[in-house]
């Protein structure tokens, strides 16, 4: 048996998934078995490096990673044949999610939508009274939450987005200016003693801690930022973490299934069978129920938060593939904030 190597995020592929999909491959006569590589996905640069070193065959890329940094990852992927007879579950995917420009190459998708979520902030309602729950992103800068909330470290653009929202800009305003190549406006916006940089430094100074691939729960944190999956685990243990529904909305992301460029022939066909399994009803319902994610499939009993907030996936709050210019400007902001931290 040959290996089909999956590169994915923590919690996305269970041992039971592997057993089931390997049974399907055997029953269909494929000479392939899947395994999940030990390296877990963390961020765009790390995923690019693992794919470039040819350490995986099927990936679970966050959509906007595909065209980040001069579209470097897109060059390592192949378009999905959405009419493949092996992708029988594709028709149940939300049509709003199947042809998003940042995942397309010459009108063909480099991705199959899988599931997503938001960069959410969750509050411990065991410790915080209902009337004290924040309502605006701006509240994160209040003294009462100093050292009591956490931020993600690797994907710092979310924190830049929050800062811009807190100053009444669009969260992707930096990218909008960069795409227009409006360097004068960018220079003014990011001036050394300017409002944006100062606000961003305050955010980094006020945080009670950073996390990388999955959020940490420590005694002093009343608010944790999270992609969602860990919240369910805590609440199943008796926790009472609740999404803070910021009036500015939530920055959203979509994770996808992708095939590396070298897959072909029987191996590519086997990869399509695997992808089709991961968009079936059972798996899609599991990511809602167990990971608190937003599913790509519409043919489900519950779509989680989408049942209550149907616009989470259609808003203009899907993180874009940042251009080299805006990305490097944000990196400089982080360096300046870290120097003062």
Task: List where the protein language model places each region.
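Short beta-strand->loop
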Residues: 78-91, 111, 239-251, 261-263
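Early extracytoplasmic/lumenal segment of secretory-pathway proteins
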Residues: 1-73
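Ligand-binding pocket segment of bilobal, Venus flytrap-like solute-binding proteins
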Residues: 148-151, 158-165, 169-242
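A bilobed periplasmic-binding-protein/Venus flytrap-type ligand-binding module shared by bacterial periplasmic
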Residues: 120-127, 254-267, 286-290
């Amino acid at each position: 048996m040959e290996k089909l190597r999956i590169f994915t995020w923590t919690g996305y592929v269970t041992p039971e998934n592997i057993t089931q999909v390997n049974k399907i491959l055997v029953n269909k006569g494929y000479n392939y078995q899947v395994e999940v590589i030990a390296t877990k996905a963390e961020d765009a640069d790390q995923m690019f490096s693992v794919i470039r070193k040819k350490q995986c065959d099927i990936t679970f890329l966050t959509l906007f990673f595909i065209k980040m940094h001069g579209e470097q990852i897109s060059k390592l992927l192949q378009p999905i044949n959405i009419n493949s007879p092996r992708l029988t579950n594709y028709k149940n995917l939300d049509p709003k999610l199947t042809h998003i420009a940042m995942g397309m190459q010459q009108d063909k998708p480099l991705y199959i939508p899988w599931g997503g979520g938001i960069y959410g902030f969750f509050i411990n309602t065991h410790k915080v009274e209902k009337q004290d729950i924040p309502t605006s992103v701006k509240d994160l800068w209040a003294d009462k939450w100093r050292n009591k909330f956490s931020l993600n470290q690797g994907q710092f653009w979310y924190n830049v987005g929050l800062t811009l929202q807190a100053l009444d800009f669009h969260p992707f305003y930096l990218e909008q200016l960069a795409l227009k190549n409006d360097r004068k406006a960018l220079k003014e916006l990011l001036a050394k003693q300017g409002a944006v940089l100062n606000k961003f430094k305050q955010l980094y100074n006020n945080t009670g801690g950073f996390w990388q691939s999955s959020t940490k729960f420590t005694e002093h944190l009343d608010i944790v930022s999270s992609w969602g999956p860990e919240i369910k685990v805590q609440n199943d243990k008796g926790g009472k973490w609740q999404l803070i529904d910021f009036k500015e909305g939530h920055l959203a992301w979509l994770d996808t299934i992708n095939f590396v460029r070298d897959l072909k022939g029987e191996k590519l066909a086997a990869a399509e069978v695997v992808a089709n399994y991961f968009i079936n009803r059972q798996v899609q319902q599991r990511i809602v129920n167990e990971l608190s994610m937003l599913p790509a499939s519409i043919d489900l009993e519950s779509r989680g938060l989408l049942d209550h907030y149907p616009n989470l996936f259609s808003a203009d709050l899907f993180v874009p593939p940042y251009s080299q210019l805006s990305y490097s400007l944000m990196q400089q902001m982080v360096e300046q904030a870290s120097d003062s931290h």
